[in-house]
């Protein structure tokens, strides 16, 4: 059963053969970006690690910056418009590029490491 609502959409992030992690996209954080991502589902791609703090994968989503941030907490989900990438934060991080916060991983975050 999904706990989704108009302002929050619960998704499953699946790392093939490794883990399934619940992810909440929150429309109130960045309405335009979350709406664009929701219309683009399902998404598939190859995951890449950036240092020890960020797991990301590139997509074909085209959305500008919205409510930009450079500081993120463990479990945050953000969109990097310059690369069209979805980013999952494995640790608290200050990043050099601005991103749009779009949601939160709700469980089993360490399975991404």
How should each PLM-predicted stretch be described?
Residues 1-29, 45:
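N-terminal intrinsically disordered, low-complexity, charge/repeat-rich segments that act as generic
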Residues 23-113:
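Glycine-rich active-site loops that engage anionic ligands at enzyme catalytic sites
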């Amino acid at each position: 059963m999904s706990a989704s609502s108009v302002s929050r959409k619960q998704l499953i992030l699946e790392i093939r053969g490794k883990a399934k992690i619940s992810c909440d996209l929150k429309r109130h954080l960045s309405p335009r970006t979350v709406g664009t991502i929701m219309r683009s589902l399902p998404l598939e791609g190859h995951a890449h690690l950036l240092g020890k703090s960020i797991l990301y994968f590139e997509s074909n989503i085209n959305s500008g910056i919205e409510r930009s941030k450079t500081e993120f907490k463990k479990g945050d989900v953000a969109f990097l418009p310059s690369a069209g990438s979805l980013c999952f934060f494995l640790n608290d991080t200050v990043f050099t590029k601005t991103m749009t916060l779009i949601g939160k991983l709700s469980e089993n975050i360490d399975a991404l490491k």
